[in-house]
Amino acid sequence: MLLRLRSKLGIHRVSCEGNDNFGSVIEKWANQLRLNVDPDSVSVSTQPGVSKLMTEIAHQGVESLGLRHGDMVTVEFKVLDTEEKNVSEKEMTNMTVSASTTSVPISSSHNKGSIRGKVKESALDIELEGETGLIPRSRSSLCRHGEKGMCEYCSPLPPWDKGYQDEHSIKHISFHAYLKQLDEVTNKKSSGSSYIPPLSEPNYEINLNCAGGHEPWPKGICSKCQPSAITLQQQSFRMVDHVEFQESELINQFIDSWRTTGMQRFGYLYGYYKRYDNVPLGIKAVVEAIWEPPQHDEQDGLTMDMDQVVKEVEDTDKLAREMGLERIGMIFTDLTDTGLGDGSVYCKRHKDSFFLSSLEVIMAAKHQLRHPNVSKFSETGLFSSRFVTCCISGNLNQEIDIATYQVSIEAEGLVEADLISGSTHPSQAYINETNDKRYVPEIFYTRKNEYNLTVKQNAKPAFPVDYLLVSLTHGFPKETDDDSTTTANTTTVFKTVAGFPWTNRQAMGQSQDYTELKRYVYKACTGNDLAELQAKLSNFHFLLYLHSIEVLNQQEWSLLIRTVTAPTLHEATEPLLNLINSPGWQTFVMILEQSM
């Protein structure tokens, strides 16, 4: 729990446990401020006008004093030596919490916006944070008021309303609905106290720098440095609600690798995040392109040279950012043909087997940890991830289908602390043993027994991996009623998905070379149809290959990016004409003319 200690130096937070002696809390607070406090002068109070000497209550537990998480305690004290441990105001008001990818400054002063002003969130998050997300309701038969009135039967519902979830079959509420629900409980508007970040990431690692006066693990351990027991629960919210593939041809081209070779395939999803109005305050991941890293495909899996993959992924990420895209997820196949000749595949993933294997869950958690979500409502400035995982496999009708998932924040914590590993049973995650480098606490999970009663069960040696899964919905842009074209056709980044070979498919007999380049784009380059040329250029894999041959300089490449990402031909015309008249483009056309 966190206690807020108010003194003449401001308000400071101290982390503690309910059974800690209150004297240790004051000691932590004094060490935090680097003060040489006279212990006989310290008095504390939780109510105005009622104070107690520290010497009287130092031995009592925090909870026994009636203190709860977030409570404010007023501290009065005298300093023995004001010159000892000279603390500047800057040192007292600024602390830095380091995360794996960034450092987020967090102020410990009484300023209510301490964390909020120092973390740069996405425009989407800022937009959703500014909305209430209230669910409107029309008048019902129980209403007894006029048209302009409102009562409990027709007043708007909060975005986390359980009844609305059940009625619309929403298994997980959106992240921002969960955040508003949590923030309402943690920071009540009537209290007027300093702001407490409602989000915190679980930390299941043992503290190797414990101040308890003992040797670090494995030579010593105490209740303060060891992680508490873990009870696994289904996560009630999801960071992303929906995955939208801008073109069905994206999936068709990706599956073609399996159709051609019978081998499995893996790829990364590139796109962006957008609001999703089908759920209150929802977010969807919009997939614009799939990029396949170098891999050696097999019938039951695949292998990769990670050094090569990391280098190529970094280069692809950089080019994608120039196009306004980011790596938002991963996708892989698990397909086995039935041999009936009708295109049917075996259904291997269902409620009686598994949805994601334990190894796949761990892989998803590692990817999510590498792509953290920035949030000013978190203690560290980071909270979970929006990285999604998609699996293409057979459904119950033996048809090829897509399933989309994330793993819970508990899964991220378990993987980061190295507490779980894969097992021979894909539906079970194995709990690692305690060793010199890690301490494994007790892990439990709840389940329904044969009497339909909820019971808590010890998770060792393994537990169902479904407790770590968060399911998402998926689909394609809906067709409009007026012209029967997809709504994505006016907003999609890339106009063409097929036609030019995808990257890293040499083993399938699909190479990217000058011959393929000429076949794909030469006619459009030498013609007079600007719309056709823009559509041909607007191809993710064509752009990656064109960049690799280094025929365009940086200015010409920028013109090309402006051309292919322009939403309309009118906006693309000017940069396209400038590109056509550039020396680099003329050289490119000459290379195509001389190619076989």
From Swiss-Prot:
Residues 243-383 form the MPN domain. Involved in the import of nuclear-targeted proteins into the nucleus and the export of poly(A) RNA out of the nucleus. Has a role in the endoplasmic reticulum-associated degradation (ERAD) pathway. Residues 88-115 are annotated as: Disordered. PANTHER family: NUCLEAR PROTEIN LOCALIZATION 4, NUCLEAR PROTEIN LOCALIZATION PROTEIN 4 HOMOLOG. Keywords: Cytoplasm, Endoplasmic reticulum, Membrane, mRNA transport, Nucleus, Protein transport, Translocation, Transport. Residues 96-109 have a biased composition (Low complexity). This is Nuclear protein localization protein 4. GO terms for cellular component: endoplasmic reticulum membrane; nuclear membrane; perinuclear region of cytoplasm.
